[in-house]
């Protein structure tokens, strides 16, 4: 995949109804790609898809489902292929964050974090893989700097993101001989509603979702012989404390 061929390709973006996923969707649509965005709730997914489709008619599919369920991801993959013909890019972005000391963390919070941030990516990749092998496509996972840097109150989130970085690097080795490229983007602080945060004016120093969207475009337009496998992204000028 390169600059001349990105137009009219199809991307499936999990967790695409807001934040990072929505920002990536906007940038790919701006480049002429078809985009499927996913979310867990039908109403939210349809509303986000309509917002994009109003500007990019005929280029957007909203498909709801839970990445934790393989059956849901198989459905979403099928709907994407039926609508656009194939899947050329998978952006595995859906994620959750539960934070607190190991004494406070509940079994439910642990399971939801691991099942969404790690098992959900496995399900997304498995459901899309036949199409991606056929198209010699690109898998991009959205991890975090928490995938290589641990912090207090982050046991579940750290475990899920460390695991995601390892998973992505391993499948990169599995799939490169099949013509499928695999990268992981590891952002630091991003302006979004993630983990219950409400964006405000003080977030201007943070990475913006569209910044990561432009980075995905750069990866897709890069010379096919080049593969940045692990990309750490930090705000260039964090606030003074």
Residue ranges and their predicted role:
Residues 17-19, 41:
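Conserved glycine-rich cofactor-binding loop
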Residues 31-48:
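Conserved glycine-rich Rossmann-like NAD(P)H-binding loop of the short-chain dehydrogenase/reductase
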Residues 42-43, 64-75, 107:
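The beta1-alpha1 cofactor-binding region of Rossmann-like NAD(H)/NADP(H)-dependent oxidoreductases
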Residues 101-102, 109-111:
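Substrate-binding pocket helix/loop in short-chain dehydrogenase/reductase
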Residues 125, 160:
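Active-site helix of classical SDR
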Residues 144:
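Residue(s) in the substrate-gating loop at a strand-loop-helix junction
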Residues 184-185, 192, 201-241:
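C-terminal helical subdomain
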